[in-house]
Amino acid sequence: MTTQVRKNVMDMFIDGARRGFTIATTNLLPNVVMAFVIIQALKITGLLDWVGHICEPVMALWGLPGEAATVLLAALMSMGGAVGVAASLATAGALTGHDVTVLLPAMYLMGNPVQNVGRCLGTAEVNAKYYPHIITVCVINALLSIWVMQLIV
């Protein structure tokens, strides 16, 4: 007969807070800091303006400035990174509050498929021939959400 130790509510709360803090500092924070550093490097070198100019015609189809493409590219790699890129671009004045609001659902619908392909799909033994289809669906969902958000906001 095993004895089960029961924790009180306060102990469970403190344990959950510790785990949450660990997740935030080891998983989320490095992505956000990396995104800020990359955007600052792109800005200092002038590449951010170049990317904005190159992507402007395509992003204009969704009513967004060209720099918004960097948020979507970051979302392919990391959701936390995409949030960091969006925050950095908003701070720099390249994106307005409206632009960030429109991009937010797209960042989450994109769902960092590059990480998921390795982590989730590989572990679940999904056939690799379906990876491009899965990533394409993520991108299409994200782009459609931008149009929907432009109508709503």
Curated annotation (Swiss-Prot):
Q: What name does UniProt use for this protein?
A: Inner membrane protein YjiG
Q: Which family does it belong to?
A: Belongs to the SpmB family.
Which superkingdom is the protein from? Bacteria
Question: What is this entry's stated membrane topology?
Answer: Multi-pass membrane protein
Organism of origin = Escherichia coli (strain K12)
Keywords per UniProt:
Cell inner membrane, Cell membrane, Membrane, Transmembrane, Transmembrane helix
Kindly give the InterPro entries that the UniProt entry links to this protein: Gate_dom (IPR011642), SpmB (IPR052549)
Asked if the record carries the keyword Cell membrane, the reply is yes
- Please list the residue ranges that the record places on the Periplasmic side of the membrane: 1-31
What gene makes this protein? Answer: yjiG
Signal peptide residues on this chain, from the entry's feature table: none
Q: Which Pfam families match?
A: Gate (PF07670)
The places in or outside the cell where this protein is found are: Cell inner membrane
Cytoplasmic topological intervals: 53-68, 111-132
Q: Does the keyword Cell membrane apply?
A: yes
Q: Report the transmembrane regions from the record.
A: 32-52, 69-89, 90-110, 133-153
Q: Name one GO cellular component term.
A: plasma membrane
